Amino acid sequence: MRQSKEERVHRVFENISAHYDRMNSVISFRRHLKWRKDVMRRMNVQKGKKALDVCCGTADWTIALAEAVGPEGKVYGLDFSENMLKVGEQKVKARGLHNVKLIHGNAMQLPFPDNSFDYVTIGFGLRNVPDYMTVLKEMHRVTKPGGITVCLETSQPTLFGFRQLYYFYFRFIMPLFGKLLAKSYEEYSWLQESAREFPGRDELAEMFRAAGFVDVEVKPYTFGVAAMHLGYKR
C-alpha cells in the first residue's frame, strides 16, 4: 500500500532522530546555524514574551527562543515525531531551561486557542507537512495581533549554474552523506525530494499573504539555497 506523505515523513524522522543534528550540520556545512542566528536578530525577540516553534524537531530553535524570552517568558515546541522530541527533551534538560514545554502534536491542527503567541516559528519543517497553506493558516490563527510568524526553509536558487549545482548536490550527494554517516539513504533521499518540490521564494511569500499575513519580508541565504519569510498579523 502506498504511504501518504504524512506517514512517510513520520517514518523518516522517527528513523533519523539520533543523527538529525549531526547531519544538519554536515548537509548545510553548518550554515543553518548562521541563518537561524540572523533570523533571530531580525525577529528581535523580547523578554517575557510567549513563542511557539512548530515542527520543532530536536528543539534547537525552541531553545534559542527560550533563551531569548528569558525565564519570565514561555516557549512551546510542537512536533509529530516522538523520537525527535525525546532528543529535544534531553537538550532542554541539559540546559536547565524551565520555560520550555515540548508537545507531541500535529502542525495541521495546532492545539492552542486563537491569538496565543507573540512569535510563531517553523524551521525546515514546512516542506514536510501535507498541506502548506493549512499550516500557515494555523500559524496565523494562533499568532497574536501584532505578532510575528517566521518560516526558515530550503528554497530554490535562481542563479544559473549554482541552481544546477544545488540540485545535483541535493539529489545525489546528500543521500550519500545519509548512507555513509547515518545509514539512512532512503530517508535522506526523501529530504531532497521535499526540498526540490517546495515553492520558491516569491510563491511562498504569496502564500503568506493569502494566509492573512501582512508586511511580508523575504531574506534569501547563501545564493538562495534557504530563505526566511516573516509576516505580521494585524
Swiss-Prot record:
Q: What class of enzyme is it?
A: transferase
EC numbers, comma separated: 2.1.1.163
The reaction(s) catalysed by this protein are: a 2-demethylmenaquinol + S-adenosyl-L-methionine = a menaquinol + S-adenosyl-L-homocysteine + H(+)
Q: What keyword terms does UniProt attach to this protein?
A: Menaquinone biosynthesis, Methyltransferase, S-adenosyl-L-methionine, Transferase
Chain's role: Methyltransferase required for the conversion of demethylmenaquinol (DMKH2) to menaquinol (MKH2).
Binding positions for S-adenosyl-L-methionine per the UniProt entry: T58, D79, N106, A107
* Residues spanning the signal sequence: none
Q: Which family does it belong to?
A: Belongs to the class I-like SAM-binding methyltransferase superfamily. MenG/UbiE family.
Q: Which Gene3D superfamilies match?
A: Vaccinia Virus protein VP39
SUPFAM superfamilies per UniProt: S-adenosyl-L-methionine-dependent methyltransferases
The pathway that the record names for this protein is:
Quinol/quinone metabolism; menaquinone biosynthesis; menaquinol from 1,4-dihydroxy-2-naphthoate: step 2/2
> Which Gene Ontology BP annotations are present?
menaquinone biosynthetic process; methylation
UniProt superkingdom: Bacteria
Q: Which organism is it from?
A: Geobacillus stearothermophilus
- PANTHER family linked: 2-METHOXY-6-POLYPRENYL-1,4-BENZOQUINOL METHYLASE, MITOCHONDRIAL, METHYLTRANSFERASE
Which PROSITE patterns does the entry link to? SAM_MT_UBIE (PS51608), UBIE_1 (PS01183), UBIE_2 (PS01184)
UniProt GO molecular function: demethylmenaquinone methyltransferase activity
What's the name of the protein?
Answer: Demethylmenaquinone methyltransferase
UniProt key word Nucleotide-binding? no
